[in-house]
Amino acid sequence: MPVVYVNIFLAFIVSLVGLLIYRSHLMSSLLCLEGMMLSLFVMLTVTVLNNHFTLANMAPIILLVFAACEAALGLSLLVMVSNTYGTDYVQNLNLLQC
């Protein structure tokens, strides 16, 4: 396995461990999720370019669109929680029963 793939996989694992450790604040969780999506995007792009998959050229762009939608929804939820309760604790999400 080339060094590039190992480094990208390690970036994904570090983001996953960060998500598991720093799950009390919503902002930390969102940053870790964004790191995971970025490492998946880079891994998918490198794989498509190295293996010359012509049919999968749009897959990294589609993943990036889903990551942008996830980030927008996460930030809107963060704004709603912080305006309502004044903090960004994940435990406050259980109280948002609309």
UniProtKB/Swiss-Prot annotation:
<keyword id="KW-0999">Mitochondrion inner membrane</keyword>
<keyword id="KW-0830">Ubiquinone</keyword>
<keyword id="KW-0496">Mitochondrion</keyword>
<feature type="transmembrane region" description="Helical">
    <location>
        <begin position="1"/>
        <end position="21"/>
    </location>
</feature>
<dbReference type="GO" id="GO:0045271">
    <property type="term" value="C:respiratory chain complex I"/>
</dbReference>
<keyword id="KW-0813">Transport</keyword>
<keyword id="KW-0249">Electron transport</keyword>
<dbReference type="GO" id="GO:0005743">
    <property type="term" value="C:mitochondrial inner membrane"/>
</dbReference>
<protein>
    <recommendedName>
        <fullName>NADH-ubiquinone oxidoreductase chain 4L</fullName>
        <ecNumber>7.1.1.2</ecNumber>
    </recommendedName>
</protein>
<keyword id="KW-0679">Respiratory chain</keyword>
<comment type="subunit">
    <text>Core subunit of respiratory chain NADH dehydrogenase (Complex I) which is composed of 45 different subunits.</text>
</comment>
<keyword id="KW-1278">Translocase</keyword>
<feature type="transmembrane region" description="Helical">
    <location>
        <begin position="61"/>
        <end position="81"/>
    </location>
</feature>
<keyword id="KW-0520">NAD</keyword>
<keyword id="KW-1133">Transmembrane helix</keyword>
<dbReference type="GO" id="GO:0042773">
    <property type="term" value="P:ATP synthesis coupled electron transport"/>
</dbReference>
<comment type="function">
    <text>Core subunit of the mitochondrial membrane respiratory chain NADH dehydrogenase (Complex I) which catalyzes electron transfer from NADH through the respiratory chain, using ubiquinone as an electron acceptor. Part of the enzyme membrane arm which is embedded in the lipid bilayer and involved in proton translocation.</text>
</comment>
<feature type="transmembrane region" description="Helical">
    <location>
        <begin position="29"/>
        <end position="49"/>
    </location>
</feature>
<dbReference type="Pfam" id="PF00420">
    <property type="entry name" value="Oxidored_q2"/>
</dbReference>
<keyword id="KW-0812">Transmembrane</keyword>
<dbReference type="InterPro" id="IPR039428">
    <property type="entry name" value="NUOK/Mnh_C1-like"/>
</dbReference>
<dbReference type="GO" id="GO:0008137">
    <property type="term" value="F:NADH dehydrogenase (ubiquinone) activity"/>
</dbReference>
<dbReference type="InterPro" id="IPR001133">
    <property type="entry name" value="NADH_UbQ_OxRdtase_chain4L/K"/>
</dbReference>
<comment type="similarity">
    <text>Belongs to the complex I subunit 4L family.</text>
</comment>
<keyword id="KW-0472">Membrane</keyword>
